[in-house]
From Swiss-Prot:
Family: Belongs to the UPF0213 family.
Species whose genome carries this gene: Escherichia coli O1:K1 / APEC
UniProt-listed SMART domains: GIYc
Cysteine disulfide links: none
PANTHER family in UniProt: UPF0213 PROTEIN YHBQ
Source species taxonomy: Bacteria, Pseudomonadati, Pseudomonadota, Gammaproteobacteria, Enterobacterales
Residues of the GIY-YIG domain: 2-77
Protein name: UPF0213 protein YhbQ
Length: 100
């Protein structure tokens, strides 16, 4: 199974873009060359602010959705403190209890 990664890219105007991929370096180069997400085209210099392995594609999609719901301040904290992401990932891996 190929591991998936969650990454955040910082634009020249200090915005954070969130995405998932199986190859962070390849995807970052695509964004840099203008062949990635339209949201990043024409945004000036891009820097990879954060990346972390998340497991399978399903978990990566859930993590991406959760991070996109965070405020800018919360995303900045995630970038600065790895423990914040570990907590978020742990909360996504906890199985939900279903009642009958």
């Amino acid at each position: 199974m190929t591991p998936w990664f969650l990454y955040l890219i910082r634009t020249a105007d200090n915005k954070l873009y969130t995405g998932i991929t199986t190859d962070v370096e390849r995807r970052y180069q695509q964004h840099q060359s203008g062949k990635g997400a339209k949201a990043l085209r024409g945004k000036g210099e891009l820097t990879l602010a954060f990346s972390a392995p998340v497991g399978d594609r399903s978990l990566a999609l859930r993590a991406e959705y959760r991070v996109k719901q965070l405020t800018k301040r919360q995303k900045e904290r995630l970038v600065a403190e790895g423990a914040v992401f570990a907590e978020l990932l742990s909360s996504l891996q906890t199985p939900e209890i279903k009642s009958d």
